[in-house]
Amino acid sequence: MNKKYSYGLFDVGNSAYLIVTLSFIFAPYFAREIVGDVQLGSAYWQWTSGAVGILVALTAPFIGSYADHVANGRIKVLIVSTVLTVLINALFWFSQARDSFIVYTLLIFFLSSYFFEISNASYNSLLRDSSNKKDEIGRTSGLGYALGYIGIVPFLLFILLFIIKTDQPILDLQKENFEHIRFIAILVSFWFFIFAIPMMTFFWKGKKSKKKKYTSIKDIKKIIWNNKLTTTGKFLIARIFYADAVIVMQTGGGVYAVGVHGFTPKELIFILIVGNLVAGVFTYIGGYLNDKFNSKMIIMWSIAALILSVFAIVSSPSKEFFFFSLLLVAAAIGPLQSASRTLMSRISPQNTQGKSFGLYALSSKATAFVGPLMAGTITYFVSQQAGFASISILFLVSLFMLSKLELNDKN
């Protein structure tokens, strides 16, 4: 299989965890059925997401450095972290709809989310290796995200038709004790693992990388600070703010839809299907625009669109208006993620991709507790609308910082 497509298929797999577990299915189930209070459950979920961010920030750069140092380290880290993600995620099956399972569910969320982030950092570090040419990095990144968004649609349709919408889910799963919702976690793990196999086997059987001299903390520091703040350092600082805001959107979007507008699981699946199709198309187009123009421009336009979407969401008077607001999010968030990954790969030397994407993960997690904790706390004391609206501040700060970022022609 072409390495570019094996790379893209991994995105098909991990999208199931990101979309179904983190946001639109299991997060609302936790808040509404396990906690029994959507507002309080939303706060718990956001706080746990923030705690994951702290741990990723403390460990990802060093794991990335290890991956650069050890022979075939990046693919080894990818395999281990991916397997741990799918195994731990399957344990959501035991999260029954009782408040006695609050701590258990949050622990599973914490561990699976942590290993997912490490897996994702390793995956991103292999972007350049997955591209046939350096001037095709944007297209490879865009293809990956596009396949992830569109490829997950059959999975969502299966969940909708055979588990959620039907009166008698497959395998005689009982709706009364939410077995049908909990079983989705097992399906997510299976889906993720199956689509991760092509990439894991391709790189494992491919050209072997050699063991390198160990990288010190000083060498990691030089990537972002070399007598002055480097271009990479400036970009990562700007990314800290918009990545925080995106985390809130991803982990809190489903809970917000349930708490404010009363969306049902069936309606959430429908939103996901349409939104993913929109995101897939715009992300694929964005990948070509990355190579034709520049990633910074794509990032800034995407952030501007997300700012508009935040205000549209919190002012939505109806489910219908909220639905179309989410389509704007879908059209912007994919190109933003793809362009960010592309820019990071281009401004980082080939032999530092592991540690560079470890820092990339750090930039989305170093203050990742700020966005979720800010949104969660404002949600707890004020309202879900106010908590969600607060992320526009983070988007605006990042937009200002990116406007000051200077890139050379090569980047």
How would you name each of these model-derived features?
Residues K76-L91, M297-A312:
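Structural signature of the two symmetry-related core transmembrane helices
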Residues T21-S42, T251-L268:
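Short amphipathic helix-loop junctions that connect adjacent transmembrane helices
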Residues K4, W93-S95, W191-F202, A389-N411:
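Multi-pass alpha-helical transporter architecture, strongest
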Residues W93-L107, V314-L326:
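Helix-loop junctions at membrane interfaces in 12-TM secondary transporters
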Residues L58-N72, F282-N294, T379:
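Helix-to-loop junctions at the C-terminal end of transmembrane segments
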Residues E117-S131, P335-S348:
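Intracellular juxtamembrane helix-capping segments at the cytosolic ends
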